[in-house]
Amino acid sequence: MLRVLTSTLRFPRPWKPLETRGCSSNPGAAGREIQVCALAGPNQGIAEILMNRPSARNALGNVFVSQLLEALAQLREDRQVRVLIFRSGVKGVFCAGADLKEREQMSEAEVGLFVQRLRGLMTEIAAFPAPTIAAMDGFALGGGLELALACDLRVAASSAVMGLIETTRGLLPGAGGTQRLPRCLGVALAKELIFTGRRLSGAQAQALGLVNHAVAQNEEGNAAYHRARALAQEILPQAPIAVRLSKVAIDRGIEVDIASGMAIEGICYAQNIPTRDRLEGMAAFREKRLPRFVGE
């Protein structure tokens, strides 16, 4: 059993640092629908994916999806990334969901292939090695909510509007919504929300457990982003390998029976034993000082 579990688990692997960091260092970034930012100073270790397609309210079109996959592949190889935030550069919108105007021009075969690609995108987000946070400062509908559901943590403005509304358009959630929403809220409630296509405010979503935090919106329209940053800053000082292995243990363990889940936890724990960070944590405790984790 342990051998089978070990062969199927995806553990964090060594990463290569990016040659270029920060949005301003890329002169072509301004015209892109997806921009990658690496924060500096006390926020070093926090990376951001900025979704910026104002003409279509960050709808999930072909170019948008391609650039998002490219950004994830880039960040996955960066060992300096300890937390990844998904945010919007379009005021009042997180992600409006699928680009239905673009999809209307597709053949039935093309639609099937594109939705399969969307499903793969959400899987890549869910499998990202470091913790991910969705900062939902506005509408997150259909695929937009599916994107947020693929993240580990969600923060929303109280006034944000979200829902899996596909049934109101003659569709059903096709990018993970039918699977991740029940795992988040339970089967009966997920069915009710999907069958009715109901929209929820950020405050309602928090009451149901769909988002971790709901905050009052500010004049700039980025209150959820600031709360997401504060949450990321809480994660930053913790041992990055232990955090990533905790993510693996939770994500894989929740899919199996508890005995298999305990075995997965044991495998993850064994991976952490030889790390320098574990020794540093014990030394810091003994010496009554804050630990300095380096991710090794």
UniProtKB/Swiss-Prot annotation:
Gene Ontology biological process terms from the UniProt entry: fatty acid beta-oxidation
The protein's name in its UniProt record: Enoyl-CoA hydratase domain-containing protein 2, mitochondrial
Swiss-Prot/TrEMBL site (Important for catalytic activity) positions: 146, 166
GO cellular component: mitochondrion
Molecular function GO terms recorded: lyase activity
Location relative to the cell: Mitochondrion
Modified residues (N6-acetyllysine): 101
N6-succinyllysine PTM sites in chain numbering: 101
PROSITE patterns in the cross-refs: ENOYL_COA_HYDRATASE
SUPFAM superfamilies cross-referenced by the UniProt entry: ClpP/crotonase
Pfam families, alphabetized: ECH_1
Family: Belongs to the enoyl-CoA hydratase/isomerase family.
Keywords: Acetylation, Fatty acid metabolism, Lipid metabolism, Lyase, Mitochondrion, Transit peptide
Gene3D superfamilies per record: 2-enoyl-CoA Hydratase, Chain A, domain 1, Lyase 2-enoyl-coa Hydratase, Chain A, domain 2
Matching InterPro entries: ClpP/crotonase-like_dom_sf (IPR029045), Enoyl-CoA_hyd/isom_CS (IPR018376), Enoyl-CoA_hydra/iso (IPR001753), Enoyl-CoA_hydra_C (IPR014748)
